[in-house]
């Protein structure tokens, strides 16, 4: 059974942690609307952190990595990868069970999309708390 999650209004790290646990347990997880995922902290601060990440590269041959994905779905995918033992067979199999999309592509637009209450912004941040959208980053 495939778990279809709607990323909009969820916090990046909390959603990623829950998704990572589920794929390790053997569930297939699909996350749609990754551009609507929230990150706590204001946009300027998150932008500085992301730009600092963009500066990290291999001096001798930058094309060998680290790879800096710009698309919101890939940023989320990488966040989940950091929570998995992705260099082991088990971790790779878990990553294969995860699919991420910006927007809602055809097979999933008809399916029921779930939310994760533990990762929702409205639950976790104060009403005045600052946050940024992954899509803007």
UniProtKB/Swiss-Prot annotation:
- What's one GO BP annotation on this UniProt entry? negative regulation of formation of translation preinitiation complex
Give a GO cellular-component term: ribosome
InterPro entries per the UniProt record, alphabetical: Ribosomal_uL13, Ribosomal_uL13_bac-type, Ribosomal_uL13_CS, Ribosomal_uL13_euk/arc, Ribosomal_uL13_sf
- The keyword Phosphoprotein belongs to this UniProt entry's keyword annotation: yes
Q: Name one GO molecular function term.
A: mRNA binding
After translation, the protein is modified as follows:
Phosphorylation at Ser-73 upon interferon-gamma treatment in macrophages involves a DAPK1-DAPK3 kinase cascade and is causing release from the ribosome, association with the GAIT complex and subsequent involvement in transcript-selective translation inhibition.
A Pfam family of this chain = Ribosomal_L13
The source's superkingdom equals: Eukaryota
Q: List the disulfide bonds.
A: none
Q: Where is the PTM Phosphoserine found along the chain?
A: 73
Localization annotation: Cytoplasm
Q: Spell out where the chain crosses the membrane.
A: none
- Subunit structure of this entry? Component of the 60S ribosome. Component of the GAIT complex. Interacts with EIF4G1.
Q: What NCBIfam families is this protein classified in?
A: L13_A_E
Family label: Belongs to the universal ribosomal protein uL13 family.
State what protein this is by name: Large ribosomal subunit protein uL13
Q: Which organism is it from?
A: Sus scrofa (Pig)
**In the record, what lineage is assigned to the organism producing the protein?**
Eukaryota, Metazoa, Chordata, Craniata, Vertebrata
User: What gene is this protein a product of?
Assistant: RPL13A
């Amino acid at each position: 059974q495939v778990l279809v999650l709607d990323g909009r209004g969820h916090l990046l790290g909390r959603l990623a942690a829950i998704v990572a646990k589920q794929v390790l347990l053997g569930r297939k997880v699909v996350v749609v609307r990754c551009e609507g995922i929230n990150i706590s902290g204001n946009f300027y601060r998150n932008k500085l952190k992301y730009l600092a990440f963009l500066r990290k590269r291999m001096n001798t041959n930058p094309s060998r990595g680290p790879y800096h994905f710009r698309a919101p779905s890939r940023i989320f995918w990488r966040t989940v990868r950091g929570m998995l033992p992705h260099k082991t067979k088990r971790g790779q199999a878990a990553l294969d069970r995860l699919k991420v999309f910006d927007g809602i592509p055809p097979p999933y637009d008809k399916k029921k999309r779930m939310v994760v209450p533990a990762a929702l912004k409205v639950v976790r941040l104060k009403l005045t708390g600052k946050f940024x959208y992954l899509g803007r980053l």
